């Protein structure tokens, strides 16, 4: 399993209004959200928001904290909202497994140490 992480800083509104298309894309577009057997996270200084994607194919993917969170586990001080945009899968939270289909959502509250993503079928990964 591999977790990729990037950090985006907030832009000054007076500067941002002068950005051309290329610069706007550089500052705001998250291009690599889904990749097989990877969790990709982008932390934005706008509201300290994390946008991420997980695509379990050959292995389960465990949501681990990244250094900037300064936490022992990912949901130590934050909540997670999940929307499945792929095939059927499961999310295991603290040992309880939730089935999640296409366009279904799951809320994970603060304080849950274990979050694991799995696909039901690797030919149609969640």
Segments predicted by a language model, with ranges:
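Short, glycine-/Ser/Thr-/acidic-enriched flexible segments
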Residues: 56-57, 88, 113
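Short, conserved beta-strand element in jelly-roll/cupin
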Residues: 74-90
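Short acidic-glycine-tyrosine-enriched beta hairpin
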Residues: 93-110
